[in-house]
């Protein structure tokens, strides 16, 4: 099968979920004897795979990259045909549906969330909600803001309508597409995210701590991911004083960056515990397993907003488990049920610092329980959530959408 990924596959310098997803899916689809074409700003990206053809997009400003991308993609699609065009971007899906149907046998669209929900949550957390409310109440600026939102929804609806197959990463997203966008259920298949079980694997904890310059005796609690509003990291900060009252030497590793970082640092200062937190900022993807393996317990304290509506299939959960670590996470669809099925951790009510602190403390207190849950986590992810198994499902869906 000859596939073209319409989204730019950026160099994997960062531990960013969207970038990781693209790299892992592309590389594993190539292992299945598919010919994969990608656009990238770094010609070395995935070029070591025999079945991946890299099409270089000259970097620069956002406007420059966008212009170069459209020129490169128009030239490629104009000169070659493909079995499948694949995208996670509604704009690309919309344009492909309008202009590229004669150049492919199937158009496949993947959805990892509800874009307007994520956008609204980020704006509300960054203090823009009041401004948006004013715009909605009247005036020309309110009119254009509303028009922009309607246009985004229209583009997404068209992209979904043009698609031959749609992949949703959670059952909640599928249900939302059926009810809010009137997409037929038989057009949508749920395929969860996964973990790179070759990269994310158990490593010696002491060696990892030495590598990172961490204390060898203190217990460490780890969070990995984008510091976005829906991650709920503020509840881990709020839980920390209770944990520290029982385990004064405990430390907290916050691995990643995002719009909430400064707020989280300020919150730790308010509690007088900023010296117990390590905010690493951006970390290369291949270094993330070192931080996870240096830790005793890993966390995913997701909030209800956005997450309860669509459920979750979080990379961090599978990566924690692939490293053989016990997990404390919010009881949200896709997370709590994975912990229940695997017996690899404890689920707690979302947005509840007390329950979060109690569960983390329970694991810190019991080394045998941590070891048992970690072992079960590893087995569960290896059997069910490797990126290779995800790619096999995507491969089957794409081939089923091809029209001869």
Where are these regions (language model features)?
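N-terminal subdomain of nucleotide-sugar transferases
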Residues: 1-45, 50-52, 80
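Conserved donor-binding/catalytic core segment of Leloir-type glycosyltransferases
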Residues: 4-6, 215-240, 253
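Membrane-proximal helix-turn-helix segments that form the acceptor-binding/catalytic region
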Residues: 70-78, 94, 98-102, 109, ...
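Acidic donor-binding loop of glycosyltransferase active sites
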Residues: 164, 276, 292-310, 325-326
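Carbohydrate-associated surface elements
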Residues: 172, 194
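A short, well-ordered alpha-helix in the C-terminal region of glycosyltransferases
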Residues: 249, 355, 362, 369-383, ...
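Nucleotide-activated donor-binding/catalytic signature segment of Leloir-type glycosyltransferases, i.e.
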Residues: 255, 262-290, 294-297
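Conserved acidic donor-binding segment of nucleotide-sugar-dependent glycosyltransferases
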Residues: 341-342, 346-353, 362-368
